[in-house]
Curated annotation (Swiss-Prot):
Coiled coil: none annotated. The gene is tatC. It is found in: Cell membrane. GO terms for molecular function: proton motive force dependent protein transmembrane transporter activity. The keyword Cytoplasm does not apply. Pfam families: TatC. This is Sec-independent protein translocase protein TatC. The chain crosses the membrane at residues 18-38, 70-90, 106-126, 132-152, 153-173, 191-211, 213-233. Part of the twin-arginine translocation (Tat) system that transports large folded proteins containing a characteristic twin-arginine motif in their signal peptide across membranes. It is a multi-pass membrane protein. Belongs to the TatC family. HAMAP family: TatC. It comes from the Bacteria. Keywords: Cell membrane, Membrane, Protein transport, Translocation, Transmembrane, Transmembrane helix, Transport.
Length: 243
């Protein structure tokens, strides 16, 4: 006997429950994370402390708000298993068995690639770009950067790297759906090169060419990796009844 389809009101009520539980999880996670903010702040400040520099704050609430921002981000990370589970419980009933299996298989890959992108960026590109930019003034100018501006710069720099590292996943999905192919990616490599540099210019937080080049390099590598992956993918349509 098939389950009775949910009404619009029941869907909205289920969505409301997902949002409430997710928000509570984020609040609890943020409260816990606030105790460890200084530890993570010291990690983010490595490029600055390596140059014997100190950051400043220029209004009364800036230091507190910056720490609160970091705590909320860490809280979201801590709460992510609960958030993902809530989202999954909401969307899974409307998916086919094959779709559920595919998504469950891809979620760990997506998380690993996102984290790998941020870690790679922080220990390579971010360190190099930040030190270069801070020393760019030479003896003529001395940097006086606020903690709020620095953290915003760091987040705007690192998060796009996590996102662009998802390129192989995007290509895998599109190839599975027979939207693109290995031949298509090879044929359009020159256009991809142009798109990569446009994306690098759009995603980097500053206008400097160095940051854009450091962003473009891994993007180009990821595109080549995606071409390699697409070569071995056989298009497959999702099938199966929704249960």
């Amino acid at each position: 006997m098939e389950d009775k389809p949910m009404t619009l009101f029941e869907h909205l009520e289920a969505l409301r429950k997902v949002i409430i539980i997710s928000v509570i999880a984020i609040v609890i996670g943020s409260i816990i994370a606030y105790n460890y903010v200084d530890y993570f702040l010291n990690i983010l400040l490595q490029p600055v402390t390596a140059l014997k520099m100190k950051l400043v704050f220029i209004n009364v609430t800036e230091a507190f708000m910056t720490k609160l921002k970091i705590a909320i981000i860490l809280g979201i990370i801590l709460a992510s298993p609960i958030i993902l589970w809530q989202i999954w419980s909401f969307v899974a009933p409307g998916l086919k068995p094959a779709e559920r299996k595919f998504i469950l298989r891809m979620i760990p890959v997506i998380i690993i690639l996102f984290v790998a992108g941020i870690v790679f960026a922080f220990f390579t590109v971010f360190q190099i770009a930040t030190r270069f930019l801070l020393q760019f003034g030479g003896d003529i100018m001395s940097p006086m950067i606020t903690i709020g501006k620095y953290i915003s710069f760091a987040l705007n720099f690192l998060i796009p790297f996590g996102l662009v590292f998802e390129l192989p996943v995007v290509v895998y999905i599109l190839a599975k759906l027979n939207i693109i192919s290995h031949e298509f990616l090879v044929k359009n490599r020159k256009y991809a090169l142009l798109v990569v540099f446009i994306l690098a210019a759009a995603l980097t937080p500053g206008p400097d060419v160095i940051s854009q080049l450091l962003m473009a390099a891994p993007l180009l590598i990821l595109y080549e990796v995606s071409i390699f992956i697409a070569k071995f993918i056989k298009p497959k349509e999702f099938s199966g009844e929704r249960k």
